[in-house]
């Protein structure tokens, strides 16, 4: 809402509707009505999602192309702490992770996101090696496994410890352990039962890894050419593409014409 330094408070229906929709997604089966009865702005919405955060992921991916059917869902509890996760891969090149603690959005992430990312990378790496989907020379990083990922993480705990006044980041270290354990166990079970999905995820991560490596080499090549392309360097002295010093030689010549075409 906004008052703009006046005595009249103006509510933005779209902002309220978006927040209420999040609440409906995060609390499966909860029905929320939003109604605007202001003259000329009449509208209402009725929201109830039996699938909870699974439907949240489907809604977020409504304009994207998933690379596998269905949303991967997992949940677990330790003591008074509860965590549930839902995610799906698409053919996009960006990642979208939305995390919540006690229904409060944590845009800067925190321990729940850290636990998820660590477990996702280690579990997929182990699965890829075990199923011979990864070779010895393949180096896949966490960012490669998260390319095209849409994920919702929701945790509920009695003593949430937020960092900063805006509650943008969750600091409970025990939540990292809980989420990591859930993902490690449940994702491994899912991959064993759904090998086609596992292969699709690994194939996408491998493609992302190779693209990242190609981009890195291209940047290094441009930097080398830029460093050696100054006015002080003669045109005949070209950059060397070989990075192994055992396979290269250095020729030192004197004068502008002494080297010829060397």
Regions found by a protein language model. Give the residues of each.
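GHKL-family ATPase ATP-binding module
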Residues: 1-262
């Amino acid at each position: 809402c906004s008052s703009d330094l006046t005595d009249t408070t103006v509510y933005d229906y779209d902002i309220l509707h978006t927040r209420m929709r999040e609440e409906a997604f995060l609390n499966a089966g909860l029905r929320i009505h939003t109604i605007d009865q202001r003259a000329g702005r009449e509208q209402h919405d009725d929201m109830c999602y039996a699938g909870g955060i699974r439907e949240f992921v489907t809604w977020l991916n409504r304009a994207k192309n998933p690379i596998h059917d269905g949303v991967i869902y997992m949940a677990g509890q330790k003591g008074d702490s509860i965590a549930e996760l839902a995610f799906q891969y698409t053919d996009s090149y960006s990642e979208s992770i939305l995390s919540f603690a006690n229904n409060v959005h944590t845009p800067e992430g925190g321990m729940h996101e850290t636990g998820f990312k660590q477990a996702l990378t280690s579990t997929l790496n182990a699965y890829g090696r075990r199923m011979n989907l990864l070779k010895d020379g393949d180096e896949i990083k966490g960012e490669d496994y998260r390319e095209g990922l849409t994920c919702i993480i929701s945790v509920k705990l009695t003593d949430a410890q937020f960092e900063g006044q805006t509650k943008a980041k969750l600091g409970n270290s025990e939540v990292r352990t809980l989420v990591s354990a859930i993902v490690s166990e449940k994702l491994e079970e899912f991959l064993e039962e759904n090998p086609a999905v596992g292969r699709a995820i690994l194939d996408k991560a491998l493609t992302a890894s190779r693209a990242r490596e190609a981009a890195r080499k291209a940047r290094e090549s441009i930097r080398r050419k830029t460093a050696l392309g100054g006015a002080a360097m003669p045109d005949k002295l070209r950059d060397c593409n070989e990075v192994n010093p055992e396979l290269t030689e250095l020729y030192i010549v004197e004068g502008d014409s002494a080297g010829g075409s060397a």
